[in-house]
Curated annotation (Swiss-Prot):
Family matches, as InterPro entries: Calcineurin-like_PHP_ApaH, CNP_phosphodiesterase-III, Metallo-depent_PP-like
Enzyme class: hydrolase
Record-listed E.C. numbers: 3.1.4.-
Residues noted as binding AMP in the record, renumbered to the chain: 10, 52, 82-83, 194
Species this chain originates from: Xenorhabdus bovienii (strain SS-2004) (Xenorhabdus nematophila subsp. bovienii)
Entry keyword Repeat: no
Protein's UniProt name: Probable cyclic nucleotide phosphodiesterase XBJ1_0953
Similarity comment: family membership: Belongs to the cyclic nucleotide phosphodiesterase class-III family.
Segments forming a coiled coil: none
GO terms of molecular function: 3',5'-cyclic-AMP phosphodiesterase activity; metal ion binding; nucleotide binding
Amino acid sequence: MKVVNLTDIHLTRNRDKKLFDVNTYDNFDFVCEEIHRIQNLTEIELIIVSGDIANDGDVEAYRYFLNKMESLKTPYISILGNHDLNKNFEITLAEEKPKYIISSREYNNDNWYITAVDTVVEGEDYGFITQDNLAELERKIITNSNFNIAIFMHHHAMPVGTPIVDSCMLNNAKAILELCEKHRVKFIGSGHAHTPRVWHHNNMTACVSPAVSFQWLSGTNTVKISKGFGFNVIDFSPDLSITSCIY
């Protein structure tokens, strides 16, 4: 099962507004064309968007996002990030009624169960998973324990070595890592860091996908960016492989 992971698209309030001299709409359009191209070569079973869809939580940005995602004609899960506004996203969903979005944020095939967990703290850049959400996640893991388990979320749980984002990562990362180790979760995917990374933690793989918008300059503690952008293709095969497509 091949899954595309998009993250940190940061669509601005209007198309002409750039973010650090980057037109995020142009990047998103390009990425969607690349996904179309990849779909002509191999089957993409699922797309997961792991947060910061819109930079300002704007309804029109969400409308653009949903229309582009629908054009890919592939089931997708959308997770919100700290830049998103849940109320506006829900308004747009109600108006647009997208066909391919998976509202449960759960997916499984014969071997894998994929789910999402909310890490957003309203009004804050850092992430935190509430006790209720941790308990619900554990319930889902136990219920689907006959599958290999993959979890996606917005905030990264392990430092990437870039202080500007490691200062606002997942605050209670230890709790979810211990939960995943307890239940032998195979994979954690996230965004937020604008810094692609892959770790192997005991028997689990953890991964931060490259941002669709821009990357932070690796190691920076001030606002310095790299204009490279991209996404990951994750092959949930017995060996589990990750291909980063960076442009």
